Design a protein with these regions (language model features):
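Substrate/ligand-engaging "lid" and interaction regions
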Residues: 1-249
Length: 249
């Protein structure tokens, strides 16, 4: 736990003060932030929805703008990864495949926007079956108001580290598994995963490791190792099939 990292080296007096004065709570961040690299002091960010904070707190934040107490943070974090981050990653990988550098460019492309809409639709259907959440609650969490000035969001930032973003429980593979478990369509999610496996940005170390694995072991072994699906799983077979089709297109 995060709290353990804080308190492990405290003496008795400091620990007593800490336990009475400090609370550590989970949050859900709903905003886009970009920078040239992880050391950059020039950070571009936009916020259109409040920071969701796990209760209880020791202070009243009712009058503080952009902060909002919210129950069921753990469940909502899982949902947010699937429903917000899933289509976002799909946008990056499809955008890369089509030669875009900015996510916004893909979403202005009629076909691209339609594809992401279908990915979102599949994930949303799975979530409504998997979790005790209403359509209204889902909209409140995931439908972002339009910002006054759109911040260009790079394909590089959103697609970075495909080894993590294509892993078993993460945004796309986790969504596909969820839909499959409830006997719901997942065709567009599977295609998005295949686009992700084609992501070969040269400056992305994880992307290069992924491409080396595919080249050396083949796509079937690579999907098994990266996405975590068994060799008998229909998801593995469908992802590999789409990968070959898209690669040869």
């Amino acid at each position: 736990m995060i709290q353990d990292a804080f308190v492990k080296d405290m003496n008795e007096e400091l620990l007593s003060w800490f336990m009475h004065q400090v609370v550590i709570r989970d949050t859900i961040i709903r905003r886009s932030t970009d920078a040239d690299d992880h050391r950059s002091l020039n950070i571009r960010s936009t916020a259109v929805l409040s920071l969701l904070i796990q209760p209880p707190l020791t202070i009243d934040i009712a009058d503080i703008e952009w902060l909002e107490l919210c129950d069921d943070i753990a469940m909502l974090k899982d949902i947010k990864v699937f429903l917000v981050n899933g289509p976002h990653a799909a946008s990056a990988y499809l955008g890369w495949y089509r030669g875009y550098t900015i996510i916004n460019e893909l979403l202005e492309d009629e076909d691209g926007a339609a594809f992401i809409q279908e990915v979102t639709k599949e994930i949303r259907a799975g979530i409504l079956q998997q979790y005790p959440i209403s359509e209204e609650q889902l909209d409140k969490l995931s439908v972002f108001p339009k910002a006054k000035g759109d911040m260009p969001d790079t394909v590089y930032r959103v697609g970075k580290d495909p080894l993590r973003k294509l892993s078993y429980d993460d945004r796309l593979c986790g969504s596909a598994r969820m839909c499959k478990a409830h006997h719901l369509p997942y065709e567009y999610i599977v295609q998005a995963i295949a686009y992700g496996l084609l992501y070969d940005e040269k400056t992305d170390e994880a992307a290069m490791q992924m491409q080396i694995l595919i080249q050396e072991k083949g796509i079937i072994v690579a999907v098994h190792q990266i996405c975590g699906f068994s060799y008998q799983d229909d998801l593995l077979k469908e992802i590999c099939s789409w990968y070959v089709r898209l690669k040869n297109k």
